[in-house]
């Protein structure tokens, strides 16, 4: 049997996936079944755009359900170590860029719960890979997509 990819995530991220799955199964799936039923009542299915759209939507919902069930089955919940001196998944990290002093704050989460617009970056991102395992006050080199790198200093690490 081949090894399944594990999905590291916070407890909060795991619970959000469970909620999303529940909504897909109890709300979205029944809604699309009803849309298909209504579209069928229009008659000829060969030229029924409502029916085609509802069937497409059903396919997307079923794919989402399978994807989320897979992630839940293979979730690796990262427990907070309580150590706010070392960066790990689940921690919120504040750092300043050296030498300009620009401050940035990110929570490092598993890829399944990453949301850069809300300050949650994937543990697989270059910046998170550079920070994980480092300590408060460490200076770290972070590679940039253009091949350059920046130097940052970790100024705060906190639990969620």
Swiss-Prot record:
<dbReference type="GO" id="GO:0070063">
    <property type="term" value="F:RNA polymerase binding"/>
</dbReference>
<dbReference type="GO" id="GO:0006354">
    <property type="term" value="P:DNA-templated transcription elongation"/>
</dbReference>
<keyword id="KW-0175">Coiled coil</keyword>
<feature type="coiled-coil region">
    <location>
        <begin position="4"/>
        <end position="70"/>
    </location>
</feature>
<dbReference type="InterPro" id="IPR022691">
    <property type="entry name" value="Tscrpt_elong_fac_GreA/B_N"/>
</dbReference>
<dbReference type="InterPro" id="IPR036805">
    <property type="entry name" value="Tscrpt_elong_fac_GreA/B_N_sf"/>
</dbReference>
<dbReference type="Pfam" id="PF03449">
    <property type="entry name" value="GreA_GreB_N"/>
</dbReference>
<keyword id="KW-0804">Transcription</keyword>
<dbReference type="InterPro" id="IPR028624">
    <property type="entry name" value="Tscrpt_elong_fac_GreA/B"/>
</dbReference>
<dbReference type="InterPro" id="IPR001437">
    <property type="entry name" value="Tscrpt_elong_fac_GreA/B_C"/>
</dbReference>
<dbReference type="GO" id="GO:0032784">
    <property type="term" value="P:regulation of DNA-templated transcription elongation"/>
</dbReference>
<dbReference type="InterPro" id="IPR036953">
    <property type="entry name" value="GreA/GreB_C_sf"/>
</dbReference>
<dbReference type="Pfam" id="PF01272">
    <property type="entry name" value="GreA_GreB"/>
</dbReference>
<comment type="similarity">
    <text>Belongs to the GreA/GreB family.</text>
</comment>
<comment type="function">
    <text>Necessary for efficient RNA polymerase transcription elongation past template-encoded arresting sites. The arresting sites in DNA have the property of trapping a certain fraction of elongating RNA polymerases that pass through, resulting in locked ternary complexes. Cleavage of the nascent transcript by cleavage factors such as GreA or GreB allows the resumption of elongation from the new 3'terminus. GreA releases sequences of 2 to 3 nucleotides.</text>
</comment>
<dbReference type="GO" id="GO:0003677">
    <property type="term" value="F:DNA binding"/>
</dbReference>
<keyword id="KW-0238">DNA-binding</keyword>
<keyword id="KW-0805">Transcription regulation</keyword>
<dbReference type="InterPro" id="IPR018151">
    <property type="entry name" value="TF_GreA/GreB_CS"/>
</dbReference>
<dbReference type="InterPro" id="IPR006359">
    <property type="entry name" value="Tscrpt_elong_fac_GreA"/>
</dbReference>
<dbReference type="InterPro" id="IPR023459">
    <property type="entry name" value="Tscrpt_elong_fac_GreA/B_fam"/>
</dbReference>
<protein>
    <recommendedName>
        <fullName>Transcription elongation factor GreA</fullName>
    </recommendedName>
</protein>
